[in-house]
């Protein structure tokens, strides 16, 4: 805290000016650091408790409150006494009491105030001599003279030297005054020395004429009003000086008691507040000085106007007093400026210190975080591309952290500069500067150490990559040499030269010594990398061994005797397959760049072609298997390389773009349209990255030594590939956002930092490209693994990947549906989608009416779900990319629980019928090709069959519960038909095997025809579910009702004889089963139990039972087709004539 200071302004004894009192201990206090001497008038002294208790606000050197002219201005204006400025012979001040008739009426208080004020004006030295009173009573009476003199003598507050009285001039009053004065002389002597004067000339004997005013016969120029104005101005100025001193004292105390703040904001606020107050104090000083100069100027003008003898001593004293006050103000201002300069310097140094400390805390936090982050960078890379990516990350991290390092170094230099400028907090600044330099050096050293390790790792991986490429080229060379051409001496010599020439390149490309590699790269070798180096070395050694064997073999062939020898093809023998070892987790050794795969496709395709020719020539199974194994390894190598490259590219996008969107240092580059849109732009790319990096890539590496089994890896993780569907569904939104913001400086800056040649949108397309790439690689692998152990897994994996691609493609169409009020997710899985030509045929009431509102078909896009089929209208969109994709306006939907199909429509192999609610609504659908129609019919049949199975199982379960809890209804039931149908239904459910697909679409058992004229009840010939079973009953009753209406309601329904086409092979069954194949034509003989029909093959004449579900199309006189509904019955509508 600053030392406390105060200003004391008082009047110097013996003068009418102001000064600071001298105390015994003043000399000691002036020796303190903050003692500032102003003058002998105003002094800045150190405050103490004793000094604070003293009265410091006195302006007059008296014990009472001093009077000012302004306070008794009205009393002074009465002019019953005035101080003209005249002096006696010894310098005594002269106070004149002019003739004032109402002198006796003046109140004592007024008289006392005027006397006190007049006697306080001269200096203490002049007042000490004593005052001379001139009482003019020439026009008064003696009684008044006596009373006046006695009153004056009794109330005069100062020393009296002489009282001169001009007695009355009337004869009577003069005679009376002489007599009275003689008799009362003793009274006057006891109180004041009084001299009675008869005339003015007598007065001149005591006081010189130059010291008397004109009314007393003198020459002294005196104007009472002018004197009163001068006194008021001088005293006003003196009061201003006093108030200024008090203000400076208060301000100095405030500055001294102010504690230094601990933060930048508070220090700045204190400095600004003190500066404003200092400016105000300086303004008050300026106004006081201006006022003093104005008063001094007026006094000097008055002196210049008058003659030299007319200038009295009081005027000179007034002028000197004003000059002294002005000098005091100037000295006070200088002392205050000096004090303020020290205070301001300390506040500014405090502010500099707070800025330094704040910057130190910020930079230290950044450097500590950077040091912690660099400490986590322990990965040295598992491939060349990975190391290059790590080096780019390190360079980017160093660039970002370099700003903080430069700031720390600059801050350290600022601290050194503060120390050089003699800052008061040197002991606090110097350690912080040293710590900043230490942090910067430590961080730079860690960056350099990390860069050195990665450079070593890069060098090692480049050597390994070179060795791997050399091995691959050697394998390509061996695979591309035709064995049949090597049988001749010339061919063997040519092949031998190729091998020897290739082996000569090994000195530059292969790893010479394994221990030397371990020793040279000891600082970076971990367990995984050592294993990787070992396997590369083993691969190199194995390849060299194969080359040496081939070389020895070729040398023998080249050295043979040239004589005709009948070539004999070796007998093909099955190669003993060694069991594939349990795959162990290892790091991939191949380069992760996607270009590698592209460069290798040409050689191994050429090798495959030449080996195919070679196999035709020699027919060697062993050579063929070896060649296929090489090709499988190439496909596996390409799969791993492209997978690693894919993972690296995803990581690059996530760290170089997605993470930077949350970086505060890059926020100013983001456009407003990108705020909070990271999930829209990148979708679930992070989820895809974590799946491939943590799971799929590592599992793929386990199959490096047995690539033919890689299909198992795909099958085990097939459900995880569903994440691509979410990404593809978000792709239109992502691409739309990219088109809006592709020119954003943020993307350009990120691309520059990553050193990418392609923009972000190319990398956002990578997941879509990758999911389509798998099926191509699986096809290649399957092509070279037909007779291997994992061929079935490869085939299943390929089918599953194609199914995922189809699901992704279908979902892209599904999200384009507009106008559907419900939730598409409630409709179940999307099975198929496609565009068709559709005609409608409706039936209303009990009469069937064809409503062909259009002669031209409607173009509709159908979406087949598990629970409904949707009809939509396709609308083409204008735009680019995904915005050009069509949208689909929803028109109507059909619940699959009430849908039936007619597989063939007469006259067109591409048409089929979808009918609804017992053919109340019929939709004739024409597919683009017969194949598409067959696929849709088959898929719809699967849906209806699965619904029927679920219905039958539920019905059997309920029937079983009812049979255990309720007795069978009595024959005397009020509804015999209904009761009979329930019993028959229960028997049917017991007979039907729920696991047999032959019973899914069977008709009711018909052991004998029903009685003529009674007809069939709706429940006696169908496997309908109870009424509470999800709508199956209502759907079936509508179908049967439709059948009855179309038959006209006449008598019982009979089986229509005719021919049927077999649509599914049937080779299994009992001794009475008829073996048929798809496409055979059979004739219906009898409908039996459990969904079996008894038919005859007209070609062979054989008869037997076949499942009714295998018979689809009836070829008879009616020309109508068999239909399948969700109720599961084979519905045979009546032929119309």
Swiss-Prot record:
<keyword id="KW-0344">Guanine-nucleotide releasing factor</keyword>
<protein>
    <recommendedName>
        <fullName>Guanine nucleotide exchange factor DBS</fullName>
    </recommendedName>
</protein>
<keyword id="KW-0446">Lipid-binding</keyword>
<feature type="modified residue" description="Phosphoserine">
    <location>
        <position position="620"/>
    </location>
</feature>
<feature type="domain" description="PH">
    <location>
        <begin position="829"/>
        <end position="945"/>
    </location>
</feature>
<dbReference type="GO" id="GO:0005615">
    <property type="term" value="C:extracellular space"/>
</dbReference>
<dbReference type="Pfam" id="PF00621">
    <property type="entry name" value="RhoGEF"/>
</dbReference>
<dbReference type="InterPro" id="IPR001452">
    <property type="entry name" value="SH3_domain"/>
</dbReference>
<dbReference type="GO" id="GO:0005886">
    <property type="term" value="C:plasma membrane"/>
</dbReference>
<dbReference type="GO" id="GO:0005737">
    <property type="term" value="C:cytoplasm"/>
</dbReference>
<dbReference type="Pfam" id="PF13716">
    <property type="entry name" value="CRAL_TRIO_2"/>
</dbReference>
<keyword id="KW-0597">Phosphoprotein</keyword>
<feature type="compositionally biased region" description="Low complexity">
    <location>
        <begin position="962"/>
        <end position="977"/>
    </location>
</feature>
<dbReference type="InterPro" id="IPR001331">
    <property type="entry name" value="GDS_CDC24_CS"/>
</dbReference>
<keyword id="KW-0656">Proto-oncogene</keyword>
<feature type="region of interest" description="Disordered">
    <location>
        <begin position="557"/>
        <end position="625"/>
    </location>
</feature>
<dbReference type="Pfam" id="PF23289">
    <property type="entry name" value="Spectrin_5"/>
</dbReference>
<feature type="repeat" description="Spectrin">
    <location>
        <begin position="351"/>
        <end position="456"/>
    </location>
</feature>
<dbReference type="GO" id="GO:0051056">
    <property type="term" value="P:regulation of small GTPase mediated signal transduction"/>
</dbReference>
<dbReference type="InterPro" id="IPR051336">
    <property type="entry name" value="RhoGEF_Guanine_NuclExch_SF"/>
</dbReference>
<dbReference type="InterPro" id="IPR002017">
    <property type="entry name" value="Spectrin_repeat"/>
</dbReference>
<feature type="modified residue" description="Phosphoserine">
    <location>
        <position position="480"/>
    </location>
</feature>
<dbReference type="GO" id="GO:0035091">
    <property type="term" value="F:phosphatidylinositol binding"/>
</dbReference>
<keyword id="KW-0728">SH3 domain</keyword>
<feature type="modified residue" description="Phosphoserine">
    <location>
        <position position="1042"/>
    </location>
</feature>
<dbReference type="InterPro" id="IPR011993">
    <property type="entry name" value="PH-like_dom_sf"/>
</dbReference>
<feature type="domain" description="DH">
    <location>
        <begin position="631"/>
        <end position="811"/>
    </location>
</feature>
<dbReference type="InterPro" id="IPR000219">
    <property type="entry name" value="DH_dom"/>
</dbReference>
<dbReference type="InterPro" id="IPR035532">
    <property type="entry name" value="DBS_SH3"/>
</dbReference>
<feature type="region of interest" description="Disordered">
    <location>
        <begin position="955"/>
        <end position="1058"/>
    </location>
</feature>
<feature type="region of interest" description="Disordered">
    <location>
        <begin position="1116"/>
        <end position="1137"/>
    </location>
</feature>
<dbReference type="GO" id="GO:0012505">
    <property type="term" value="C:endomembrane system"/>
</dbReference>
<feature type="domain" description="SH3">
    <location>
        <begin position="1055"/>
        <end position="1116"/>
    </location>
</feature>
<dbReference type="Pfam" id="PF07653">
    <property type="entry name" value="SH3_2"/>
</dbReference>
<dbReference type="GO" id="GO:0005085">
    <property type="term" value="F:guanyl-nucleotide exchange factor activity"/>
</dbReference>
<feature type="compositionally biased region" description="Polar residues">
    <location>
        <begin position="1119"/>
        <end position="1128"/>
    </location>
</feature>
<comment type="subunit">
    <text>Interacts with GTP-bound RAC1. Interacts with CDC42. Interacts with RHOA. Interacts with CCPG1, which results in specific inhibition of its exchange activity toward RHOA, but does not affect its activity on CDC42.</text>
</comment>
<dbReference type="GO" id="GO:0031234">
    <property type="term" value="C:extrinsic component of cytoplasmic side of plasma membrane"/>
</dbReference>
<dbReference type="Pfam" id="PF00435">
    <property type="entry name" value="Spectrin"/>
</dbReference>
<dbReference type="InterPro" id="IPR018159">
    <property type="entry name" value="Spectrin/alpha-actinin"/>
</dbReference>
<dbReference type="InterPro" id="IPR035534">
    <property type="entry name" value="DBS_PH"/>
</dbReference>
<keyword id="KW-0472">Membrane</keyword>
């Amino acid at each position: 805290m600053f030392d406390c200071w105060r200003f004391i302004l008082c009047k110097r004894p013996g003068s009418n000016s102001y000064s600071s009192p001298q105390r015994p201990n003043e000399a000691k206090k002036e020796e303190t650091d903050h003692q500032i001497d102003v003058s002998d008038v105003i002094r800045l002294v150190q405050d103490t408790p004793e000094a604070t208790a003293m009265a410091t606000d006195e302006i007059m050197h008296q014990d009472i409150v001093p009077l000012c002219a302004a306070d008794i201005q009205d009393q002074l204006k009465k002019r019953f006494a005035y101080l003209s400025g005249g002096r006696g012979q010894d310098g005594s001040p002269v106070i004149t009491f002019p003739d004032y008739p109402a002198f006796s009426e003046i109140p004592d208080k007024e008289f006392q105030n005027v006397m006190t004020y007049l006697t306080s004006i001269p200096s203490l030295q002049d007042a000490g001599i004593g005052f001379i009173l001139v009482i003019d009573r020439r026009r008064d009476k003696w009684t008044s003279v006596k009373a006046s003199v006695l009153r004056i003598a009794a109330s005069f507050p100062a020393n009296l030297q002489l009282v001169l009285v001009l007695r009355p001039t009337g004869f009577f009053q003069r005679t009376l005054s002489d007599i009275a004065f003689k008799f009362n002389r003793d009274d006057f002597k006891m109180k004041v020395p009084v001299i009675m004067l008869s005339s003015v000339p007598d007065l001149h004997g005591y006081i010189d004429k130059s010291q008397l005013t004109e009314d007393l016969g003198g020459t002294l120029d005196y104007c009472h009003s002018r004197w009163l104005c001068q006194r008021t101005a001088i005293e006003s100025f003196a009061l201003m000086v006093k108030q200024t001193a008090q203000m400076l004292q208060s301000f100095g105390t405030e500055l001294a008691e102010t504690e230094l703040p601990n933060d930048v904001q508070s220090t700045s606020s204190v400095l600004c507040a003190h500066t404003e107050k200092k400016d105000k104090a300086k303004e008050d000083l300026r106004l006081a000085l201006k006022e003093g100069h104005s008063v001094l100027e007026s006094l000097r003008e008055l002196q210049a106007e008058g003659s030299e003898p007319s200038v009295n001593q009081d005027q000179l004293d007034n002028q000197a007093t004003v000059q002294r006050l002005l000098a005091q103000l100037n000295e006070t201002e200088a002392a205050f400026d000096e004090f303020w300069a020290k205070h301001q310097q300390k506040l500014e140094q405090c502010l500099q210190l707070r800025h330094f400390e704040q910057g130190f805390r910020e930079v230290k936090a950044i450097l500590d975080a950077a040091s912690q982050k660099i400490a986590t960078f322990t990965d040295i890379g598992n491939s060349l591309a990975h190391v290059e990516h790590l080096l780019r990350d390190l360079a980017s991290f160093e660039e970002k952290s370099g700003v903080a390092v430069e700031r720390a170094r600059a801050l350290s230099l600022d601290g050194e500069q503060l120390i050089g400028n003699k800052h008061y907090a040197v002991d606090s600044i110097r350690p912080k500067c040293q710590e900043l330099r230490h942090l910067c050096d430590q961080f730079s050293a860690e960056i350099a150490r990390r860069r050195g390790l990665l450079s070593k790792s890069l060098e090692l991986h480049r050597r390994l990559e070179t060795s791997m490429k050399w091995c691959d080229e050697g394998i390509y060379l061996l695979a591309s040499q035709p064995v049949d051409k090597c049988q001749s001496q010339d061919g063997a010599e040519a092949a031998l030269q190729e091998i020897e020439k290739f082996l000569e390149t090994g000195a530059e490309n292969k790893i010479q010594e394994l221990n030397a590699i371990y020793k040279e790269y000891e600082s970076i070798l971990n367990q995984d990398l050592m294993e990787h180096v070992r396997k590369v070395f083993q691969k190199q050694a194995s390849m060299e061994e194969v080359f040496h064997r081939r070389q020895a073999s070729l040398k023998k062939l080249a050295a043979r005797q040239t004589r005709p020898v009948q070539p004999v093809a070796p007998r093909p023998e099955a190669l003993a397959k060694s069991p594939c070892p349990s795959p162990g987790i290892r790091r991939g050794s191949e380069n992760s760049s996607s270009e590698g795969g592209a460069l290798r496709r040409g050689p191994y395709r050429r090798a495959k072609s030449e080996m195919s020719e070679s196999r035709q020539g020699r027919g060697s199974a062993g050579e063929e298997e070896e060649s296929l194994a090489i090709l499988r390894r190439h496909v596996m190598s390409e799969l791993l390389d492209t997978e690693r490259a894919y993972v690296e590219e995803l990581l690059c996008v996530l760290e170089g773009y997605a993470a930077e969107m949350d970086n505060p240092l890059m926020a100013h580059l983001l456009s407003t349209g990108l705020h909070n849109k990271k999930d829209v732009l990148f979708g679930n790319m992070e989820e895809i990255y974590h799946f491939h990096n943590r799971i799929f890539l590592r599992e793929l590496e386990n199959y490096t030594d047995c690539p033919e089994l890689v299909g198992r890896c795909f099958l085990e993780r097939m459900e995880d590939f569903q994440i691509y569907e979410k990404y593809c569904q978000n792709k239109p939104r992502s691409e739309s956002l990219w088109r809006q913001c592709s020119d954003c400086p943020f993307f350009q800056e990120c691309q520059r930092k990553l050193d990418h040649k392609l923009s972000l949108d190319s990398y956002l397309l990578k997941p879509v490209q990758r999911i389509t790439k798998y099926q191509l690689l699986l096809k290649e692998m399957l092509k070279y693994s037909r007779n291997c152990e994992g061929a079935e897994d490869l085939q299943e994996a390929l089918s599953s990947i194609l199914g995922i691609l189809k699901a992704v493609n279908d979902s892209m169409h599904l999200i384009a549906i507009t106008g559907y009020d419900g939730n598409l997710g409630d409709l179940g899985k999307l099975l198929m989608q496609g565009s068709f030509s559709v005609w409608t045929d409706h039936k209303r009431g009990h009469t069937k009416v064809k409503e062909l509102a259009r002669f031209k078909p409607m173009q509709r896009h159908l979406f087949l779900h598990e629970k409904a089929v949707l009809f939509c209208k396709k609308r083409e969109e204008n735009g680019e990319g995904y915005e050009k994709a069509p949208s689909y306006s929803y028109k109507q939907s059909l619940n699959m629980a009430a849908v039936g199909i007619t597989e063939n429509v007469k006259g067109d192999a591409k048409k089929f019928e979808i009918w609804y609610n017992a053919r109340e609504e019929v939709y004739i659908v024409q597919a683009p090709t017969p194949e598409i129609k067959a696929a849709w019919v088959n898929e719809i049949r699967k849906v209806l069959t699965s619904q029927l199975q679920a219905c039958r199982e539920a019905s059997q379960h309920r029937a079983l519960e009812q049979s255990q809890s309720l007795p069978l209804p009595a024959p005397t039931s009020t509804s015999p038909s209904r009761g009979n149908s329930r019993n028959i239904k229960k028997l049917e459910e017991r007979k039907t095997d729920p696991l047999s697909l032959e019973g899914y679409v069977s008709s009711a058992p018909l052991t004998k025809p029903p009685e003529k004229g009674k007809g069939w009840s709706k429940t006696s010939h169908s496997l309908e579910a109870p009424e509470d079973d999800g709508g199956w009953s209502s759907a079936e009753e509508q179908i049967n009702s439709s059948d009855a209406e179309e038959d006209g309601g006449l008598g019982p329904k009979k089986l229509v004889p005719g021919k049927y086409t077999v649509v599914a092979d049937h080779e299994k069954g009992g001794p009475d089963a008829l073996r048929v194949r798809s496409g055979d034509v059979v004739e219906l003989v009898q409908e039996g139990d459990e969904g079996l029909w008894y038919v005859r093959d007209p070609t062979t004449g054989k008869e037997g039972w076949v499942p009714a579900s295998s018979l689809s199309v009836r070829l008879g006189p009616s020309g109508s087709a068999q239909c399948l509904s969700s109720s599961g019955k084979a519905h045979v509508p009546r032929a119309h004539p």
